[in-house]
Amino acid sequence: FIVYQIIFQVCAIPFIWLKRSLTELTFVWTALITVIVIVAVVKARKRIPEDFCFVKKILKEHRLLMGITIIAVLIVCWYATLNGELNDDSLYYIGVVNTTVTTDTMFQYNAYTGVAMPSHYFRRVLVTFEINAAVVCRIFGVHPIIIMRIFRGNLNVILTALTIALIGTTVFCDEKTVEKSAILVCVSMALYFIADSTMYSNAAFFLNRTYEGKAYAGNALIYFMVYLCICLMQTKRKSY
C-alpha cells in the first residue's frame, strides 16, 4: 500500500502541475499499474500458490477462531460504513474527488464553491490521496461517495487488521502464534470503540473519518511502522 501510494504520487504530481486532465492521468496510471502487476505476478509465480496454500491451511486448522476474527473485522467495516461524519472536512475531501471526476481536472476548482481557482493551492497539490480516489472512480465507473465513504473505510479496516496480525505473528513466536495473533486483532477491534472518545483520536479517524488520508496514517501505517521496528530490533538482537 505504501509503495502503491508513493508510485502514484510520483506519477500524478507532473500531471497536476501541468494542469493535464484526469483522463490522461487515468490512462497512464492504468497502463503503468498493469505492467507492474504483470511483472510482479511473473516474478512471484512460484510463491503465490505457496502463500495461497498456507492461508488455506490456517483457515482450515483454526476455522472457529478465524471465523470469529473475520466477523469482528466485518462488524467494524459495517460500523465505519454507516457512521461516517458529516462536516466541512467530509464536504471538502469528498468534494475534491467529485469535482475532479465531474470536471476532468485536478485541483483547478474550489471543492466548496465550484469556483475556478486562479492558481494551484500548493499544499493540496502535493497530496494525491484524493486524486487517486478520483482515478479509481474513473477506471471502475463508481461514484465518489461510494469510494470515499465505503471502499476507503473498509480498506483501512482490513489493512489495519492485517497489520496488527503481522505484529502478533512477530511478537508471539511460539506454538500458538496464529491463535494469539487472531485474539490480538479481535481485542484491538473492540478497543477502537472504547478509544473513540474525541474527534481527533486515531479511533475517530478509523471509525468515523475514514475518507481522510489521516485515517490510514494514524492506523494501518503507524502499526506497520511498529511492525518494522519490532523486526529491526529482533534482527539486531540476533546479530549480537
Label the predicted regions.
Residues 222-239:
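Membrane-interface transmembrane helices that cradle and orient dolichyl/undecaprenyl
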Residues 10, 163-164, 225:
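Hydrophobic/aromatic residues in alpha-helical transmembrane segments
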Residues 16, 239-240:
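Membrane-interface alpha helices of multi-pass inner-membrane proteins
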